[in-house]
Regions:
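Conserved active-site-proximal phosphate/metal-binding subdomains
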Residues: 10, 125, 132-151, 157-193
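Active-site entrance/lid segments in N-terminal catalytic domains of soluble metabolic enzymes
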Residues: 1-149
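Active-site metal-binding loops of divalent metal-dependent hydrolases
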Residues: 1, 155-156
């Protein structure tokens, strides 16, 4: 989810419910990111899965993912571009790497480089777009192309949408925009209404 909307309170709330809580790291300073990761860990009692989402195109991308890895983050999700450097950071610190992809070919590249999973986004996704295909079109292509978990993203608003993506073969579903209105989101009150 967008810069400073998904911070420690939202990531921790998701992790406490059994999901993977992601902190939107792009746009944060390194000290702010460290503080947010530590706060999320505190809010989960050290349990649950906490990761970051970082935009490859962001100015401090490599510094952000390295800082998060040093803090013992569970996984790094990266979009808005593709980075080979992220895999070296993941290996060095033992952190799972989950790139956001928009094609079967890029998913295969990610798998060869060591991705633990991929998030595949269709045109319905709120950000990091790289395709004109809908998630329902692209998802089966990616699932067939790789042997790692495939997480669908884009257009999932409720349980029916999640169920449909799981029926199409997704191993999981990433939701972002839906959480912008949550109590734990850092979004402005006007956006939450």
């Amino acid at each position: 989810m967008a810069i400073r909307l998904s911070t420690a309170p939202l990531a921790a709330a998701v992790a406490n419910e059994g999901g993977i809580g992601l902190i939107a790291a792009s746009g944060m300073g390194l000290d702010e990111l460290r503080k947010d990761i530590r706060m999320a860990r505190e809010l989960t009692g050290g349990k649950g899965i906490i990761g970051i989402n970082a935009m490859v195109a962001a100015r401090q991308f490599l510094d952000l993912i390295t800082t998060a890895a040093e803090e013992g983050i569970d996984l790094i999700v990266a979009g808005a571009g593709f980075s080979r450097d992220i895999f070296a950071v993941g290996r060095r610190y033992g952190v799972e790497v989950v790139p956001i992809v928009s094609s079967a070919r890029l998913a295969q590249t990610a798998e060869k480089l060591g991705a633990s999973a991929v998030v595949v986004e269709g045109t319905e996704a709120g950000g990091h777009l790289g395709t004109q295909q809908s998630i329902k079109e692209i998802l089966p292509e990616v699932i067939e192309a790789v042997n790692i978990p495939v997480i669908a993203a884009g257009g999932a608003i409720d349980g029916n949408d999640v169920a449909e993506l799981l029926k199409l073969g997704a191993n999981g579903v990433q939701m972002g925009s839906r959480f912008a209105a949550s109590e734990e989101s850092n979004a402005a009150p006007a956006l939450k209404e």
